[in-house]
């Protein structure tokens, strides 16, 4: 099983950017933890962070034939990127959207996700654990789908 993990704009600044909201753990630490956890599950992850919307879309286009699913933290693109939403839908791979903070406890303009509707699930508000929880949910979904022939969105 292979999962593409995508991180949107400014997530490369985790650990220094607004630590009272996002915590003090760096994206590199999240990648290391997630990679180790995935390996223990027999899962390979491909991990990227890009600040450009088109770069994230290009990665989806590049890898969709090789992967089983997508774990994505779109960052600010969550709130307005129809193009990213369309890319997720176009490739037909199950995706889970994750966020460190609970968007519904943030500013009003952050309380809507246009990308979540292209995903089978959404996990937010658990800090760095959101990534691991999202990965667990995606792996379990893929295993059930493969074993039971389940399809479609939850």
Curated annotation (Swiss-Prot):
Keyword tags: Amino-acid biosynthesis, Aromatic amino acid biosynthesis, Lyase
Residues that bind substrate: 73, 79, 86, 100-101, 110
GO-annotated molecular function: 3-dehydroquinate dehydratase activity
Superkingdom of origin: Bacteria
Active site: 22 (proton acceptor), 99 (proton donor)
EC number(s) recorded for this UniProt protein: 4.2.1.10
Pathways per UniProt: Metabolic intermediate biosynthesis; chorismate biosynthesis; chorismate from D-erythrose 4-phosphate and phosphoenolpyruvate: step 3/7
Class in the EC hierarchy, top level: lyase
Site positions for Transition state stabilizer: 17
Coiled coil start-end: none
Catalytic reaction list: 3-dehydroquinate = 3-dehydroshikimate + H2O
Gene3D superfamilies listed in its UniProt record: Dehydroquinase, class II
GO terms, biological process: amino acid biosynthetic process; aromatic amino acid family biosynthetic process; chorismate biosynthetic process; quinate catabolic process
Function recorded in the entry: Catalyzes a trans-dehydration via an enolate intermediate.
Record PANTHER family: CATABOLIC 3-DEHYDROQUINASE (PTHR21272:SF3)
Assembly and oligomerization: Homododecamer.
Protein family (similarity comment): Belongs to the type-II 3-dehydroquinase family.
Protein known as: 3-dehydroquinate dehydratase
